[in-house]
Amino acid sequence: MFRGLIYFINMSLSPNWKALQASTPGGGAKGQPGDAKRNRAKAWRAKKSENKKVVGQLDPGLSKAKNVAKSKVIKCQALQIPLRARVHKNDPTRPTLGAILQSDDAGLEEALHAPPQPIEPVLARWKCAPGKFIALDCEFVGVGPNGARSILARVSIVNYYGHVLMDEYVKPIERVTDWRTWVSGVTPAMVANGISFSEAQERVKRLLNGRTLIGHALINDLAVLGLDHPRADIRDTQKPQYFKTVCGCKTPSLKHVMKECVDLNIQQGEHSSVIDAQAAMLLFRCYKKEF
């Protein structure tokens, strides 16, 4: 009896169900059993063809790792991701980061191509204000066994136009066991007359308040400063997928990103936290859509 009732209900509803299927996009009859398999095969052949095109553009003289990175760039360019602010390679007469950043957004690419000025022009007063965006970079020295742990030795902050808002050496709060001068550029004499850690922390905190923070691998700088910042207000130049693809690694260095994306060389010797902060700001301004 129940089987007959179920059969009767199915028979009475089937015309309505078919009408609903016909009126709904994609609601018609399912494809043939072999359709999914054929579609997968078609997609595989298309991908294989694309890979062959990429391989044809690789240089057999390069190492496997470099060719892998190059293939990623080729595929990225095939997706029409623009390489903004590209400039001529190996040009010894290049403007400084400070001079480039003084330009407005519309003239930024032109500034990258411009010859260096003997004297950098004086910034307008409104370009010297903190503004909405600031870039931060710190230099560390090592403490503890083998200098493995980092503490703050220098902190620099620049605004949207590269103007230095803060650049201070900081007295170490612990005994330094490794000055890391070869990379940090910091010596005992430099920090002897530096400000206290608490003063540096408070000044940075005031500048961060209500602003968007730019920097490279900022988790390290904020940790050493003992500060945090809302994630929504952070633009870390190590994070964009485009930079990772162009550099061919998951955690590209600031030096690597600068060379690959704006063709500028930084950190040729000892680091400068001012230059590194300006470099991060330049990357942000050239590639805003990637953040």
Curated annotation (Swiss-Prot):
It comes from the Eukaryota. This is RNA exonuclease 4. Exoribonuclease involved in ribosome biosynthesis. Involved in the processing of ITS1, the internal transcribed spacer localized between the 18S and 5.8S rRNAs. SUPFAM superfamilies: Ribonuclease H-like. One of its GO terms (cellular component) is nucleus. Its EC number is 3.1.-.-. Its main location: nucleus. It is found in: Nucleus. Keywords: Exonuclease, Hydrolase, Nuclease, Nucleus, rRNA processing. It comes from Yarrowia lipolytica (strain CLIB 122 / E 150) (Yeast). GO terms for biological process: RNA processing; rRNA processing. It holds the Pfam family RNase_T. Belongs to the REXO4 family. GO terms for molecular function: 3'-5' exonuclease activity; exonuclease activity; nucleic acid binding. Residues 133-284 form the Exonuclease domain. SMART domains: EXOIII (SM00479).
